[in-house]
Amino acid sequence: IRDYDRALAETEAFLPYINNWATCDCFCPKVFAKHKKELLVPIRRWLDSGEAYTVRYGMEMLMRYYLDDAFRPEYLEWVADVRSTEYYINMMRAWYFATALAKQPDAALPWLTEKRLDLWTHNKAIQKAVESRRIPPGTKQLLRGLRSRS
């Protein structure tokens, strides 16, 4: 779909039917890449929806499109502010922060050094970052020392 408005409408119609992480993570209209400013409005709505895979999709879009040139530090806060007991939401939060460590280390690292995330997300983000090939060895060593037990 090449038209942004139509792609957004179709995405919004499809989101309530997603019931697994694979479907959630594999679809993304290419036209979204050309409309990053406009896409922030539905992303905020998705993050606040309370629906597990809609929330996950919002985080996925932030991870996909807003950790490079379009990055702003408040996007880290948007993801960190999502509170849920849903495993697949929390896993995406950790994945987002691990990816942010690779792409925006100066902004993301303080979230871990200052222990600003909940314990599970903190440790899972460290685990995913340490497993990543995109994180330099020195950063991995630092991250290992930041693991927390409580």
Which residues are covered by each model-predicted region?
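Alpha-helical scaffold domains
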Residues: 1-150
